[in-house]
Amino acid sequence: QMCIRDRGSHEFYMGYAVKNGIMATLDMGHFHPTEETYDKISAMLLFTPEILLHVSRPVRWDSDHVVILNDSVQMLAQEIVWADALNKVNIGLDYFDASINRIGAYVIGSRATQKAFLQALLSPIKQLRDYESSGRFFQRLALLEESKSMPWAAVYDYFCLKNNAPAAEDYIATIEQYEKEVTSKR
């Protein structure tokens, strides 16, 4: 499917995409510093069957760089999962940063994104919704706060080990070895 990338007026590109039946791209690096991409997902999905996200860590008005596990990426994953939109959102990661190893940058970004989605998927969504729909906002907020300290990192390490991938920071040595044995000889 054809896609249009947002590099100017978001409203113009969104309208153009909807009018012409093409997928719009939301680029995390191309919005005003006070705007958050995750705030736009649910609204856009009311008018278009799917969207493409360019996930990055914006360096304000400069360029996009390696994705890290920051609030924006966590909220992005949470919005997609909580809106039950995993099958409607296509995700591309930015891993460019000329100052660091590109394989390392790619791995950092991929793992950060996986961790954000894992956190969102492990959230007690049903209970949070039940509290909200019954007007029990204290309970909802308390559970939301408690869910922030769930042991999701242990779950992620287990996921890595089950898939023969290095857990925790063990990937650093693997990338250093690959750099020494392969990429340094190019």
Where are these regions (language model features)?
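Short, small-residue-biased leader/transition segments that mark boundaries at the very start
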Residues: 2-4
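Histidine-acidic metal/acid-base catalytic patches
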Residues: 14-26, 32-186
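Non-catalytic scaffold segments within catalytic domains of secreted glycoside hydrolases
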Residues: 7-8, 114
